[in-house]
Amino acid sequence: MNNIDLRVYSFIDSLQPQLASYLATSSQGFLPVPGDACLWIEVAPGMAVHRLSDIALKATNVRLGEQVVERAFGSMEIHYRNQSDVLASGEAVLREINHAQEDRLPCRIAWKEIIRAITPDHATLINRQLRKGSMLLPGKSMFILETEPAGYIVQAANEAEKAAHVTLIDVRAFGNFGRLTMMGSEAETEEAMRAAEATIASINARARRAEGF
């Protein structure tokens, strides 16, 4: 499968409680639990993800939590308690498509912002949208982040939760852009933003060069 483009290869060593619970709520497959190791892979074209999911599942004991097949991109999420199983399945996928982790696309921050002292109207509107996380409370600060490709948003969310006392409102890792919404005090949301930015920088240190990134 030499014609497969590796867009996202994102390993998380230990899912944080809020993110794990969010993924379990939104998962169409086998739900993860806090502390699981997790690997998010995005490839193009989208249909290739079926074959890659099959290879990953047959390589070790990992479970498949998500698989989304779009025309342009395909995404899969695998997880397991033992990091070694997740990493071994990831290596099996990389061998199949003749790529290394460093061949993945870099992550571009398309938007980042902290909105302080959210108004009741704004909070209510966000809470009534199709979110699967906690409710946004008026008066709190809201951290929003958008990444391209979409799949990297999960790792950014995990590290932001690890670094700061913030509440996960929503995280969407499919389509052209990934979107993250978190809530907390002004200081905590600023810390979450710094952690997310540092995570993206570490991803880009081991990614291929691409125009516009």
UniProtKB/Swiss-Prot annotation:
Instruction: Report the residue ranges where the short sequence motif Gates the pore is annotated in this entry.
Output: 70-71
Q: Which CDD domains match?
A: BMC_like_1_repeat1, BMC_like_1_repeat2
> Any phenotype upon disruption?
Not required for growth in ambient air.
SUPFAM superfamilies linked: CcmK-like
Biological processes per GO annotation: carbon fixation
Record localization:
Carboxysome
Indicate whether Repeat appears among the record's keywords.
yes
Please describe how this protein is used in biotechnology or industry, per its UniProt record: Expression of 10 genes for alpha-carboxysome (Cb) proteins (cbbL-cbbS-csoS2-csoS3-csoS4A-csoS4B-csoS1C-csoS1A-csoS1B-csoS1D) in E.coli generates compartments that resemble Cb, contain RuBisCO and have its catalytic activity, showing it is possible to make artificial, functional Cb using these 10 genes. Cargo proteins can be targeted to these organelles. Artificial Cb assembly in E.coli requires csoS2-csoS4A-csoS4B-csoS1C-csoS1A-csoS1B-csoS1D (but not the gene for carbonic anhydrase, csoS3).
SMART domains in alphabetical order: BMC
Q: Which GO terms describe its cellular component?
A: carboxysome
Domain called BMC circularly permuted: residue spans: 5-106, 108-213
User: Subunit info?
Assistant: Homotrimer. Forms a dimer of stacked trimers, the same faces interact. Probably forms a CsoS1-CsoS1D-CsoS2 complex.
Entry remark concerning the domains of this protein? Contains 2 BMC domains, trimerizes in a staggered manner to give a hexamer; each subunit in one trimer interacts with 2 subunits in the facing trimer. Each stacked hexamer can form a pore of about 14 Angstroms in diameter. Dimerization of the trimers forms a channel-like compartment, accessible via an open pore. This channel may be large enough to accomodate transport of substrates into and out of the carboxysome.
In which family does this protein belong, per the annotation?
Answer: Belongs to the EutL/PduB family.
From the Swiss-Prot or TrEMBL record, give the protein name: Carboxysome shell protein CsoS1D
Q: Which organism is it from?
A: Halothiobacillus neapolitanus (strain ATCC 23641 / c2) (Thiobacillus neapolitanus)
Q: Which gene encodes it?
A: csoS1D
